[in-house]
A protein has these predicted regions:
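Phosphate-backbone binding interfaces of nucleic-acid-interacting proteins
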Residues: 1-218, 353, 376, 386-387, ...
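A carboxyl-terminal module marker
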Residues: 2, 452-455, 602-605, 610-611, ...
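Glycine/proline-enriched, intrinsically flexible loops and inter-domain linkers
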Residues: 5, 11, 24, 64, ...
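Beta-rich nucleic-acid/ligand-interaction surfaces
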Residues: 40-44, 214-216, 501-506, 530-549, ...
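Conserved mixed alpha/beta core segments that line enzyme active sites in large multi-domain catalysts
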Residues: 50-78, 162, 256, 267, ...
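Mobile "lid/hinge" segments at catalytic clefts and subdomain interfaces of large enzymes
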Residues: 128-133, 137-139, 153-154, 167, ...
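Extended, well-folded interaction surfaces typified by the phenylalanyl-tRNA synthetase beta subunit core
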Residues: 193, 426-588, 722, 775-777, ...
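Terminal amphipathic helices with adjacent charged low-complexity linkers/tails
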Residues: 202-228, 405-433, 440
Length: 808
């Protein structure tokens, strides 16, 4: 938001401060000023001069010698400007006197930081005591002064007073401030809003424009009707009519104010609507009344696929959420964004229909994105406007039309306002505000702040009445903030917080996840982070059956694309994508882990999905099934699950190798799965090595985990180990061996460890060699052979009964 300081001062009489003082005070009171630009920064000793005569230069064909009246004296100036010709006289021009400064050169290039100083000198032997200026030398451009000649001296109007300040005459004695306005302060997206804040900040009176009654004795309600069909998207629509339009340039004061806002003047009618939009923050639109079929306005939504050509000549395809302004037969504008080519204002216009309305900001914002068209007006509407502002703004526009004699305003207004807004009321609780702020501001002082902000006080009800333009004031904290702004944040004393402090801690579930990360990192895995969104096509890549529960997903209503259209139900795709990327970049021995959240859709679409964290491991290279199994057991031991997990090879997981996979159980409860990636799935992800996957369900293990530690003394007696080697059928899982060891080991069994598996030419076909190390220990004595041998014989006997051959 940009505003002119002179425009602000017109509404805040008595405001006297430097540009820097204004910036600092406004920023401290909550209206942050990003930067400011003083138009007259490098303009000095520039006056209105009148050319008395122009003669040829005796020694230069392209130079002329001018005698110029600058008020206090006549000076001689030599110039080469193409629009100053021999024999001409009477023109009034900006003249920089000897010792003065201009902002830049006549070429309109980048302005030098300190401007250009002008000194008396000679041009081809003829003395020149100053310089006549182009608009570029004054720091402006032809964009804002369209009547300025290209490369020539700027000719001032006949009303310019010789000897007076040319800078002031051109409106360049001004400073433009750029504000950072937050979206909750919609009222500050207007000059009136900024001026109100400035008046409150500097404790000056606030005098907004006084809008007088306008219009002739006719009644506009006999000329046009308005019907709002989409009431939820248009809360108010005001229309007025102006007859006998007289297009002309707008006055210089209006052009100057528009230029400070970055708006190029066009003509009186267009300039008035732009002026009111900046002044009130209320966009307006004008239609050629004679093109409005039936002289009727209908506010409705479009039909899906409806076509409409906007003022820029572009045909746009609309949907059922697009709000349209229509006449009795056709659309004439996209509400709040741009009018239609079919109702465009031309130079021949005789009668105009003016519109000031309040449209739903969210709808306008969505429409601008859909059709790819954003305008100054839509930028205002998107933020949500005050419906009470519409009538005031359109009446102000009609007042300016009458003052500038731009047309004849028809009396009255068509005002369709189905559900008028009411002013909010909040209890006045000064003690609570002081407690929140740590201040001691009196009730009277607070009420003086609110009075400056146009917040009324109902003494009988002890309530604050909030004006409709302050949509941001909704609760105690908002009111306390207003007190802080005008008491002064820099005046609030620094105090230490009172009360007891408590030390935060992580949840038990987070402790489990941290333990998973520690184990993974300790065993050489690097953390991966992948998207929770994926494509439904992933399920086919993973070979999931058509009726798989994992195909039931939470669908995203506004996805970035098909590849991100559903929430994942398995953590596998993201992990395999990361492994594939590493493989294709020729990285070797890749080991990744992720604490991936999955989303399992509920049977009832109105219920939230079951969100579960899955501890996921993926690796290829120097890993195998058993090293991955070791990570599982290390993790379970870390979180207090001391028993050995069991494995069921009949897992039936489609994306894992059918003979190299298993469900993982603990205390007969499934906690996850492990396996080698199915070769077909590996091919679909372009992974050319054996890849292993582990998934552990964190919520399930959390129920069984414990970080309670029981300390025992160091064993007094040594352990005795026995190694056994056996040959067993390939299809028989080693878990069967471990069951026998646990069953027959008795009380003296301390631990066992699988340390070798071998398949090769020395082992008969269909079999594998397996070796275990078994440790025995007693708490009360050193074990002897007579203690261990019976136990080992029981183990051997059960192994042989299962068809396992011992190697001796």
């Amino acid at each position: 938001m940009n505003t002119s300081l002179n425009w602000i001062k017109a509404m805040v009489p008595g405001l006297e401060c430097t540009d820097q003082e204004f910036r600092d005070a406004m920023t401290l009171s909550g209206t942050k000023v990003e930067c400011f630009n003083a138009f007259d920064k490098n303009l000095d000793k520039i006056v209105v001069g009148q050319i008395l005569s122009v003669e040829r230069h005796p020694d230069a064909d392209k130079l002329v010698i001018c005698q110029v009246n600058v008020g206090s004296e006549n000076v001689q100036i030599v110039t080469g400007a193409p629009n100053i010709e021999v024999g001409s006289s009477g023109q009034k021009v900006p003249v920089v006197l000897d010792g003065g400064k201009v902002a830049g050169g006549h070429d309109g290039g980048a302005l030098p930081e300190d401007g250009i100083k002008i000194k008396k000198g000679k041009l081809r032997g003829v003395e020149s005591c100053g310089m006549m200026c182009s608009i570029e030398e004054l720091g402006s451009s032809r964009e804002f002064f369209p009547d300025a000649p290209e490369g020539g001296i700027y000719i001032l109007g006949d009303d310019a007073v010789v000897g007076s300040s040319a800078v002031e005459y051109l409106g360049l004695n001004d400073t433009v401030f750029e504000y950072e306005i937050t979206n909750n302060r919609v009222d500050c997206y207007s000059v009136i809003g900024i001026a109100r804040e400035a008046a409150a900040t500097f404790r000056k009176p606030f005098n907004p424009p006084v809008v007088t009654k306008t219009g002739n004795d006719e009644d506009v309600n006999t000329m046009v009707s308005v019907d709002i069909e989409a009431k939820e998207l248009c809360s108010r629509y005001v229309a007025r009519v102006v007859k006998n339009i007289r297009l002309a340039p707008s006055p210089k004061w209006m052009q100057q104010r528009l230029m400070t806002a970055g708006i190029r003047p066009i003509n009186n009618i267009v300039d008035i609507t732009n002026y009111v939009m900046e002044e009130y923050g209320q966009p307006m639109h004008a239609y050629d009344y004679d093109t409005i079929a039936g002289h009727k306005i209908v506010v409705r939504t479009a039909t899906d696929g409806e076509k409409f050509v906007t003022l820029d000549g572009q045909e746009r395809t609309l949907d059922a959420q697009t709000l349209l302004i229509c006449d009795g037969e056709k659309p004439v504008g996209i509400a709040g964004i741009m009018g239609g080519e079919n109702s465009m204002i031309t130079d021949d216009v005789q009668t105009m229909l003016f519109e000031a309305a309040t449209f739903d900001g969210t709808n306008i914002r969505k429409t601008t994105k859909k059709i790819g068209l954003r305008t100054d007006a839509s930028g205002k509407f998107e933020k949500g406007l005050d419906p009470e502002n519409a009538m005031e703004a359109i009446n102000r526009a009609c007042q300016l039309i009458e003052e500038l004699d731009a047309g004849d305003v028809v009396g009255g207004a068509v005002d369709v306002y189905p559900d008028p807004v009411t002013k909010k009321r909040l209890p006045f609780e000064p003690a609570k505000y002081n407690a929140l702020l740590g201040t001691d501001v009196s009730d009277e002082e607070m009420l003086s702040y609110f009075e400056r902000l146009e917040v009324e006080y109902d003494k009988d009800a002890n309530e604050l009445i909030i004006p409709t333009f302050r949509q941001d004031l909704n609760r105690d904290a908002d009111i306390a903030e207003e007190v802080a702004r005008f008491f002064g944040y820099d005046n609030i004393p620094t105090t230490l917080p009172k009360g007891e402090t408590t030390m935060g801690k992580i949840s038990f579930e987070q402790s489990i996840e941290d333990a998973a990360s520690e184990v993974a990192q300790f065993t050489g895995f690097s953390q991966a982070m992948t998207y929770s969104f994926e494509s439904p096509k992933v399920f086919d890549k993973l070979k999931l059956q058509a009726d798989s529960v994992y195909r039931k997903t939470v669908v995203i209503s506004n996805p970035l694309g098909e590849d991100f259209s559903v929430m994942r139900t398995l953590p596998i795709h993201g992990m395999l994508t990361s492994l594939s990327t590493n493989y294709n970049r020729r990285n070797k021995n890749v080991k990744l882990y992720e604490l991936a959240k999955v989303y399992l859709a509920a049977d009832d679409v109105n219920e939230l999905p079951d969100e579960r964290v899955e501890f996921t491991l993926g690796a290829f290279g120097s890993v195998d099934f058993y090293s991955m199994k070791g990570v599982i057991e290390e993790f379970l031991e870390k979180i207090g699950m001391k028993k050995k997990p069991t494995y069921d090879a009949k897992a039936g997981i489609p994306f894992l190798h059918p003979g190299r996979q298993a469900d993982v159980y603990y205390d007969d409860k499934k906690i996850g799965y492990i396996g080698e990636l199915h070769p077909d799935v590996a091919d679909s992800y372009s992974i050319g090595e054996r890849t292993y996957i582990v998934v552990i369900d964190i919520p399930t293990v959390t129920e069984m985990a414990s970080f309670d530690k029981k300390f025992t003394g160091i064993a007094k007696f040594p352990a005795v180990t026995r190694d056994i080697s056996m040959v067993m059928p390939k299809e028989l899982p080693v878990g069967e061996v471990e069951k026998i060891i646990e069953k027959r080991g008795g009380k003296i069994l301390e631990s066992y460890n699988l340390f070798d598996i071998y398949e090769g030419s020395q082992i008969k076909e269909g079999f594998k060699s397996v070796a275990y190390s078994i440790a025995f220990r007693a708490k009360d004595r050193t074990l002897e052979d007579k203690d261990i041998t019976p136990v080992m014989e029981k183990i051997f006997k059960d192994l042989e009964a299962d068809g396992i051959e011992l190697r001796k």
